[in-house]
Structure formats: C-alpha cells, structure tokens
C-alpha cells in the first residue's frame, strides 16, 4: 500500500528559481480543498485577485487586480496548457476572459505572475497572468451535488490506458437558479478530454474541451429602486427577458521536450447575450469566431552561468459576426453595429539569464509583437478598414540571494494590451491599436523550513485607457493612468496535514490629467485573503476568508463602494471508494455587493435614477455531494 503524499504548491521553494517577488504557484491540496461558489474563484489563488459577477453564471466574471477593474479580463491573461483563453475584439469587452467552461477537477496547478517583466506574456498581461496546467490522469469516479437555490451538479471522469499512453476524460452538467426573482435557469454542460503519450524526446499531449451554457441573467439594479413597487428587494429582476448563451470548443496538441515545447490550437466560439444595464434600452450582443494559433519555445544553456530561451507565437482570429443590436423584450428592433473582423498577430521573444556569482542572477529580455486588423462592415453607416501596428517590449530584472533564506528582487519592463479592432478603424475617434504600459517593482522573499513570506512594491503607468465599448458600439475615452501599491503574502505548513496562507494587497490608481477627477472608478484599493487547509487520511477541510476593500465609483471620489468580507468553508470525509463533502458559502450571510457601479438608469415606473447600481452578493448557500471512485 502506497502512502498518500500531500502536496501544497504554495510550499515550493522559489529562492533561486523565481524571477520576481510577485511570482508564485498553487497546486495540489491548495486547490483540492478550496470551497468555490463559482469556478472562476480558482483564479483567486493569485494574491489580490478578486473574481466577481454581475450578470449571471454564464457570463465572464469581473476581475480586480493591482488597482484595475479588469472588466472581463482586459489586463489579466490566462492560459490552459499554453492555450490562451482571453478573446480580443469581443462582442462585449476587449480581452473577455470566460473560464466558466473549466471543470475544477481538471486543474492540477496554477502558476501566476504580475506585471510586465516576462517575455512569454504578451497581450492582456500588464496586471498579471495565470498559467493553468491540467491533470495527466485522474481516478475513475462518478459524483453528484445538490444545493440551495436549485444547484445541481453531476460529474464523471477517469483515465484508461490507450495505445501506450493514457486517455483521461471528464464531463459535468450543472443547473442553478440562484436567489433571484427571475430564476437563472442555468443549463451548463462541459467536457474535457486529454491523451498523453510518452515519446523518445519527452511527451505528447492532445486535448479537446467543449462548453455550452444557457442562462437568464439578473443584472445589477439601481439601489434607489429597491423597496419600490417594481423591485421588492435586492434580488429583483427588472428585465426578465434577458438571456445568454455560450458555446466554445478548444482543440490543442502539445509536444514537450527536455528543453523545448511546441503547441498548436484551434478554437470555435459562439456567444450572444441580451442585457439591459440602463433598463430603458435592451441590447443583444453577439460574437462568433474561429481561432487558430501556436507557440514554439526552446531553452539553451550557453555555459554554466548563462542560459537563453527564445520563442515565437502567433494567433489568428476569424470573427465572422460581432456586434450589438437594439432589442425590446428579446425582439429585434434595429442593428447598432455589425462587423466581420480578421485579426492576426505574431511575436518573437528572447530572454537571457546570467549568474555571474553564486548569489546573483540577472535577466534581460526583449519581445516584439506585430498586429494586423481588417474590419469589414456588415451593415450600412458603420466604419470599416484595415490597420497594422507593432510594439517592442524590453524587460530587465535582478535577483540577489542575501542569505540562503532571503532573496531580493528588482524588475522593470514594458508591456501592452491591444484594443478592439472596430475602434481602431473608427475615423471619428480612433483608438490606439497597441497601448503601452511601463511597470517596475522591488521585492523580497523569505523562506525558512515550511514557512515562506514575500513582499512587493510595484508601479505601473499606462499611456492611455481609451477603449471600445461593446455595449454602445462606440469609443470611450480614457486618459493616462498611474498605479502603485504593495503586496504581502505568507504560507506556513506547521505539520504535513495542516497549512495556513494569507495575502494582503493595497493599491492606488490615479488619472494623470482628467477634468472630471483623478480617481479611477472601480480601482479596488485593498484586498485580502486568509486560508486554512487540513488534509488527513480520512478528513479534509478548507476555510477561505476573502476581503474586498473600498473603491471609488466616480472620478471625483464623491461616491465609494462599501468593503465586504466573505467566509467560505468546505469539509470532506473519505472512506475507501467513497468521498462525501459539503460546502457552506458566505457562512455569515454577508449582505455585501458582488459588483457596484454608479450611473443613470431609467426604470419603467420610476423614471431616471442617478446613483449606485449594484448586484447583491449571493446569500448563505449550502451544497453537498458524494463521489464514488472505482
């Protein structure tokens, strides 16, 4: 009988390995015992990142990190086995990051980094990046869950030997109504399969994943409407005709050698959603596309003190139909914007690591990106055209191990994010194709036994936050910004079966020159997390405490959000082939807000309402399940 080995990814030794104090990894028991309201909360392993939701379980989440309201992913990029998930020139928002199709059991490890300091992170990575690695195999199982507010989940999966390799497949089906007046009626199906085969040079991995969801979103509502004849409480649904649907398929093949890797992928994506954020003008947004791309990277050891890695990557988005229409109660009224877009990009990068003395490491890298945009109008009176752009992003870093337990870091680099192709070709008010940002940070890492601690102070300057807004099919101006802040993280594993982790982040975001005010709306000023993980032969438990701090709602800081703290817990019992578990989410029934904005709405029967518009945090929720392993 083999003894089970419990692994905590946060406990890995990173002194002499990491290039910056803000880098890290999470895996193993860290993920297995984590209670989750929604799968996007897996990304909250990144210190300071908060994944919220304002429009139903099928829509991409709202992300906060390093003083950014990342909308749905603009400056935070995510990869799964080297395949990018962010969508550029999307029907709702640039860099749209929908991870709802992930099956939690498939994620084995998440490596994360912050800032603009690494050459293999390009578009959408100025705030940070997450690299998810999926499992190679899994014990055969079938399981089911039930919970409050119509939550149901069925899942099954396993691994079988095939042709000298291993074939792993998992599938899940979820339904959920939520606490909303209009039941969400979520119908979610996802499938993931992976074939792994050893080769003479390393390994081959071929993967296929599919995801389909339909839902009826209850969006943010004006707080002034709560308690009136049209809105009984914070869970009211002011437009019950809103609907959403997502279909996504991803196929990929990856070859992994000792000092190189190559990835090819193809994706099909079809999305549409009706929403009514102002409640007097319903819109229908849509996006249908094919994506193809790949990456090749190789490392070279020049001599014992100097190593080099170089890579190329490319991506092509053939967007057949993207835009927005005016609808009323789900019925088409008029088209606002409808385009076909072909967007291609290519990049080449190289990075050198030099260790002149035993305790000192220095890094220098260079990345060059080229983008080509071709926009064709699919209706009259909307702009079309073509444009190309390029950008070069240098990176520098240094790491000094002051002792065996302390390493100091300094990093600097340039990065970028692309803008929506439709805004780039708008002759009236064109946006910049590629927006540059400059980041730097200093930090330290302390590791002693099973305890580690890191501290980082960072700065990030963006030339412009001009962007194309899918809701209105128009360009929204935004001036240059300056951000800075600090991050503290800690992990302690006093015994093999018990671990604690904590993180606290603080940030300050300001416009450089804005007549309406210097404060950046939605820029969270602090966030924190504390966790306990307990894993033994028969029992597992996890506790997560998440704090989301205040942020300005308007540029002059005259209205601000309220802070909120949420506690989630999970417990499980294992016996032979049975695994029984339960999660209690929002343990203390916090009456917070998942998302808050400030703008004018016009609710029928109430007239214009100017002020806070929010979506309530979901109330205390109990879920329980059982898995049978065979």
Positions of predicted regions on the chain:
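Transmembrane beta-barrel wall of Gram-negative outer-membrane proteins
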Residues: 148-175, 180-218, 241-256, 300-306, ...
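Extracytoplasmic beta-strand/coil segments of soluble accessory domains associated
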Residues: 8, 23, 40-87
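Short strand-turn segments of transmembrane beta-barrel domains in outer membranes
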Residues: 111-119, 128-160, 170-171, 179-181, ...
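Short acidic/polar hinge/loop motifs at secondary-structure boundaries
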Residues: 83-114, 132-133
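Gram-negative outer-membrane beta-barrel transporters
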Residues: 357-362, 370-371, 458-461, 477-555, ...
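Membrane-embedded beta-barrel scaffold of Gram-negative outer-membrane proteins
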Residues: 254-275, 401, 405-413, 434-496, ...
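N-terminal periplasmic "start-of-domain" segments of outer-membrane beta-barrel proteins
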Residues: 3-34, 59-62
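C-terminal beta-signal and adjacent terminal beta-strands/loops
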Residues: 500, 547-554, 572-630
């Amino acid at each position: 009988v083999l003894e089970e080995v419990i692994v905590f990814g946060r406990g890995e030794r990173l002194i002499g390995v990491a290039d910056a104090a803000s880098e890290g990894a999470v895996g193993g028991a860290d993920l297995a015992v984590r209670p989750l309201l929604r799968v996007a909360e897996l990304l909250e392993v990144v210190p300071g990142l908060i994944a919220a939701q304002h429009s139903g379980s099928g829509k991409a989440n709202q992300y906060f990190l390093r003083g950014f309201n990342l909308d749905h992913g603009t400056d935070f990029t995510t990869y799964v086995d080297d395949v990018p998930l962010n969508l550029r020139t999307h029907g709702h928002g640039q860099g749209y990051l929908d991870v709802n199709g992930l099956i939690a059991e498939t994620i084995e490890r998440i490596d994360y980094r912050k800032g603009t300091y690494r050459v293999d992170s390009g578009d959408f990575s100025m705030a940070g990046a997450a690299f998810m690695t999926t499992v190679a195999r899994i014990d055969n199982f079938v399981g089911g869950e039930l919970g409050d507010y119509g939550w149901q989940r069925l899942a099954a999966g396993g691994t079988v030997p095939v042709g000298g390799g291993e074939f792993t497949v998992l599938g899940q089906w979820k339904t959920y109504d939520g606490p909303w007046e209009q039941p969400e009626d979520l119908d979610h199906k996802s499938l993931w399969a992976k074939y792994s085969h050893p080769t003479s040079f390393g390994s081959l991995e071929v993967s296929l994943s599919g995801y389909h969801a339909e839902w009826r979103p209850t969006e943010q509502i004006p707080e002034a409407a709560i308690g009136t004849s049209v809105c009984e409480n914070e869970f009211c649904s002011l437009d019950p005709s809103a609907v959403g649907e997502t279909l996504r398929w991803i196929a990929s093949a990856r070859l992994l050698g000792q000092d190189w890797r190559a990835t090819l992928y193809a994706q099909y994506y079809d999305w549409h959603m009706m929403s009514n954020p102002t409640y007097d003008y319903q819109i229908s947004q849509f996006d249908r596309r094919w994506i193809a791309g790949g990456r090749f990277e190789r490392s070279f050891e020049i001599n014992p003190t100097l190593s080099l890695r170089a890579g190329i990557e490319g991506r092509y988005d053939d967007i057949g139909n993207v835009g927005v229409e005016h609808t009323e109660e789900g019925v088409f009224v008029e088209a606002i914007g409808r385009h076909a877009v072909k967007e291609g990009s290519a990049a080449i990068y190289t990075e050198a690591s030099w260790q002149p003395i035993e305790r000192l490491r220095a890094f220098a890298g260079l990345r060059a990106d080229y983008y080509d945009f071709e926009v064709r109008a699919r209706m009259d009176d909307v702009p079309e055209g073509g444009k190309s752009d390029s950008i070069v992003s240098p990176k520098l870093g240094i790491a000094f191990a002051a002792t065996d337990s302390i390493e100091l870091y300094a990093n600097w680099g340039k990065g970028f994010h692309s803008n929506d192709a439709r805004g780039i070709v708008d002759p009236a008010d064109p946006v910049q194709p590629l927006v540059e940002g400059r980041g730097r940070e200093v930090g330290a890492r302390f590791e002693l036994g099973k305890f580690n601690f890191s501290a980082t102070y960072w700065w990030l300057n963006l030339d412009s936050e001009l962007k194309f807004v899918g809701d209105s099919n128009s360009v929204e101006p935004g001036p240059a910004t300056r951000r800075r802040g600090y991050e503290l993280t800690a992990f302690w594993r006093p015994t093999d079966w018990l671990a604690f982790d904590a993180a606290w982040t603080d940030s300050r975001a300001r416009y450089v020159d804005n007549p309406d005010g210097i404060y950046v709306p939605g820029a969270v000023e602090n966030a924190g997390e504390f966790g306990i993980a307990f894993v033994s032969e028969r029992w597992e438990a996890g506790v997560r405490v998440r704090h989301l701090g205040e942020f300005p709602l308007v540029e002059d800081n005259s209205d601000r959000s309220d802070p909120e703290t949420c506690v989630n817990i999970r417990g499980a019992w294992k016996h032979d082939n049975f695994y029984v578990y339960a999660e209690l989410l929002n343990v203390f029934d916090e009456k917070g807000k998942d998302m808050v904005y400030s703008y004018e709405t016009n609710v029928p029967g109430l007239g214009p309402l100017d002020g806070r518009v929010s979506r309530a945090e979901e109330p205390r929720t109990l879920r329980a399940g059982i898995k049978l392993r065979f």
